[in-house]
């Protein structure tokens, strides 16, 4: 029997390890406040620039991979829980809690990613995530409206709740207090007020 399949598996594991090391290095460079560049990430990961380009294609591809890693480690993969709650208000609360937890866990790096996006040097795909949050809120608020709270379904409510669940709002509102156990109920109280869920 040929050892080739085993060697291919070892190679795949090595490639995954290199990819993870590069993403980790990118996160470290972002948090450090140093200028974010492929060179800086490659140096920190101990690989050649070409290796970074080979794995991610572009700087934007690398930033997108960083955001995917943050989403995974920050709990955004739990978002389906918000849509499976029998009570749509409980679903909205779960949605808010998941985002507040994510923002709290990755606050510093999200500030840097948002700054890069504002400067036009961030991942183009990073901006596509906010419309996904809007879509999720649209579904949840429509469910609440259909359950007899018609005011929750208005466009004004949707846009206000969208603003209240943004990282920019969370970052300002939380101040020095980033504990999601403290911030989440305060954000949810504002969401309840705006959506007429008192």
Identify the residue ranges that each predicted region occupies.
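Hydrophobic alpha-helical connector segments
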Residues: 65, 78-104
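Basic, helix-initiating cap at the start of DNA-binding domains
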Residues: 1-44, 60-61
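Short helix-capping/turn signature of helix-turn-helix
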Residues: 56, 115-120, 167
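Short hydrophobic/aromatic patch on the recognition helix
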Residues: 47-56
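Short glycine/proline-centered loop/turn elements that form peptide/ligand docking sites
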Residues: 35-37, 59, 147-153
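Generic hydrophobic, amphipathic alpha-helix propensity
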Residues: 14-26, 41, 51, 66-70, ...
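Alpha-helical DNA-contacting segments of helix-turn-helix folds
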Residues: 29-30, 61-70, 110-113, 129
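Amphipathic alpha-helical packing segments from all-alpha helical-bundle domains
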Residues: 97, 101-108, 114, 121-148, ...
């Amino acid at each position: 029997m040929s050892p080739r399949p085993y060697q291919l598996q070892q190679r795949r594991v090595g490639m995954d390890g290199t990819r993870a090391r590069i993403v980790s290095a990118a996160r470290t460079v972002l948090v450090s406040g140093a200028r974010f560049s492929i060179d800086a990430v490659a140096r920190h990961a101990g690989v050649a620039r070409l290796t970074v380009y080979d794995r991610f294609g572009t700087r934007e591809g690398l930033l997108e991979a960083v955001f995917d890693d943050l989403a995974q480690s920050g709990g955004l993969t739990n978002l389906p829980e918000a849509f499976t709650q029998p009570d749509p208000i409980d679903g909205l609360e779960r949605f808010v809690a998941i985002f507040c937890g994510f923002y709290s866990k990755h606050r510093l790096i999200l500030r840097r990613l948002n700054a890069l996006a504002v400067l036009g040097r961030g991942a183009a795909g990073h901006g596509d995530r906010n419309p996904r949050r809007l879509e999720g809120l649209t579904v949840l608020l429509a469910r609440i409206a259909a359950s007899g709270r018609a005011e929750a379904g208005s466009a004004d409510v949707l846009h206000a709740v969208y603003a209240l669940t943004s990282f920019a709002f969370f970052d300002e509102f939380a101040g020095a207090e980033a504990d999601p156990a403290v911030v989440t109920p305060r954000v949810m109280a504002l969401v309840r007020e705006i959506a007429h869920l008192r």
